Regions:
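N-terminal amphipathic, basic helical "cap/leader" segment at the start of enzyme domains
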Residues: 1-79, 175
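C-terminal helix-cap and adjacent tail motif
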Residues: 6-13, 17-22, 140, 145-175
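Small-aliphatic-rich amphipathic alpha-helix that forms the alpha element of a beta-alpha
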Residues: 33-34, 81, 89-134
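Solvent-exposed alpha-helices and their adjacent loops that cap or buttress functional pockets
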Residues: 40-43, 72-75, 138-144, 163-166
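Proline- and acidic/polar-enriched loop/turn elements at helix boundaries
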Residues: 45, 123, 146-147
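Short, charged/polar surface micro-motifs in flexible loops or helix N-caps
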Residues: 53-58, 87-89, 132, 156
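Short, solvent-exposed amphipathic alpha-helical segments in soluble enzyme
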Residues: 65-67, 97-99, 166-168
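Active-site-flanking beta-strand signature of metal-NTP-handling nucleotidyl enzymes
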Residues: 80-84, 150
Length: 175
């Protein structure tokens, strides 16, 4: 893997062929997730659910459409990976969100290497977080809140090198 090559090609993919992710691809994605750092090494504070059942994906999509008034917020991807964490309720503690984000980015980069499309998902996750029946269907443990997700799947949308503007993020260098 060439990390910079993957970083400069990674993008949000929103079109999918519907071809399922293979068992080998899933295993490699999960290995990338397991390699992610988690605050203070507290891996028991985060859980991951891999959703491939079409009926569950449809239910999540429907919940998101109902809440946000937009159809197909999962873009027809055959896989949704949901990250849920124990939130402490303290606004100053964002480690749960940060942990999910690091896992999602590892998954994103692995998807690039595997030639799979991927897109970081928030709207459907927000809808899922408010639907106790769906959380139960996804076997999200009591006390955990869905905080991030990634759709993954085969796509005809190829990864090509992007020109990333310098200073895209306002930056101050204090030396």
């Amino acid at each position: 893997l060439n990390t910079m090559k993957a970083l400069l090609r990674r993008k949000s993919v929103r079109t999918y062929t519907g071809v399922p992710v293979t068992d080998d691809q899933r295993a490699q994605l999960l290995k990338a997730a397991y390699a992610s750092p988690v605050a203070m090494g507290q891996y028991d504070s985060i859980v991951m659910t891999v959703v491939e059942k079409p009926e569950l994906l449809a239910q999540i999509d429907a919940a998101a459409a109902k809440q946000f008034g937009r159809e197909k917020m999962l873009y027809g991807a055959p896989m949704l990976i949901v990250l849920a964490t124990k939130l402490k309720g303290d606004a100053s503690d964002n480690s749960g969100y940060s942990n999910a984000a690091t896992v999602i980015e590892n998954l994103n980069l692995a998807a690039v290497e595997l030639g799979l499309g991927a897109c970081h998902i928030w709207g459907a996750i927000a809808a899922l977080a408010e639907d106790d029946a769906l959380k139960q269907a996804l076997k999200i443990p009591e006390g955990f809140t869905p905080v991030g997700g990634l759709v993954v799947g085969d796509s005809a949308d190829a990864y090509t090198k992007r020109d990333i503007p310098d200073n895209r993020i306002a930056t101050e260098i204090l030396d």
